[in-house]
């Protein structure tokens, strides 16, 4: 009896350490070097991805590099090989799209995250007129996401944009804007990437079913199970 009780107690104590994150996004979290629903660690992982993007851009051939800048009033396409064009648009803030040599294809996702301008001063060379001078939005690349598949958990307070970057294709017309979700979060279609930008509490984790479960309730169920059995 004593040994059984000890085993149950040790299992309850060690459970938080061995508890898996999410079946769907565990590999993503490990790859980004972040913890679930921790904004600070998440931003660090995203900045790591950003440095990879700009490193690829810096070593690329400038003749094959194309930069599309979006601002409030104008959308300008600049290319070193062909003349650019201008179109009017009503985007809310300045954003950058970049393509480098190697023609990497995939969905480019704006997760609504920002970083300080000082951190990006060495890598961001955009001269767009952004009202918020101290912050700039950047983009995260998915891995091996097909053209017709995208999966995002969209916050009710954010509007995300998906842009497919492909070799020899015009970026215009490929932008898909995901409007605000009616509930707390909404999942769209299928893909490997799942960003939950609506989670703010540290006492929550994302389960394999994509729902948010409070830690307190979860451990209460475990405790009741141990008492009964």
Curated annotation (Swiss-Prot):
Location, primary (coarse class): membrane
Region (Disordered): 63-92
Protein name, entry field: Predicted GPI-anchored protein 19
Keyword annotations of the record: Cell membrane, Glycoprotein, GPI-anchor, Lipoprotein, Membrane, Signal, Virulence
Glycosylation (residues): 87, 184, 189
Keyword Transport on entry: no
Membrane-related topology note: Lipid-anchor; GPI-anchor
Gene: PGA19
Stimuli inducing this protein: Up-regulated upon interaction of cells with host macrophages and upon milbemycins A3 oxim derivative (A3Ox) treatment.
UniProt subcellular location: Cell membrane
Endpoints of the signal sequence: 1-20
Function: Predicted GPI-anchored protein which may have a role during host infection.
Annotated propeptide span(s): 209-229
Lipidation residue positions, type GPI-anchor amidated glycine: 208
Top-level taxon in the UniProt lineage: Eukaryota
Gene Ontology CC terms, in alphabetical order: plasma membrane; side of membrane
UniProt key word Glycoprotein: yes
Biased composition (Polar residues): 81-92
């Amino acid at each position: 009896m004593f040994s059984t009780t000890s085993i149950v107690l040790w299992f309850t104590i060690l459970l938080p350490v061995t508890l898996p994150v999410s079946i769907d996004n565990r590999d993503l979290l490990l790859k980004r070097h972040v913890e679930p629903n921790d904004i600070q660690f998440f931003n660090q992982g995203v900045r790591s991805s950003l440095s990879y993007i700009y490193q690829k851009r810096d070593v690329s051939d400038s003749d094959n590099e194309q930069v599309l800048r979006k601002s409030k009033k104008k959308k300008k396409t600049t290319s070193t090989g062909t003349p650019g064009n201008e179109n009017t648009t009503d985007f809310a803030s300045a954003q950058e799209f970049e393509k480098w040599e190697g023609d990497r294809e995939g969905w480019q996702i704006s997760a609504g995250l920002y970083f300080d301008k000082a951190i990006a001063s060495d890598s961001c060379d955009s001269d767009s007129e952004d009202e918020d001078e101290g912050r700039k939005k950047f983009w995260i690349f998915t891995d091996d996401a097909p053209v017709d598949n995208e999966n995002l958990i969209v916050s009710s307070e954010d509007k995300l944009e998906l842009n497919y970057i492909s070799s020899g294709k015009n970026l215009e017309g490929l932008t898909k804007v995901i409007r605000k979700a009616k509930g707390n979060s909404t999942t769209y279609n299928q893909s490997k990437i799942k960003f939950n930008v609506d989670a703010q509490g540290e006492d929550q984790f994302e389960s394999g079913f994509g729902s948010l479960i409070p830690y307190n309730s979860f451990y209460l169920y475990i405790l009741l199970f141990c008492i009964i059995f």
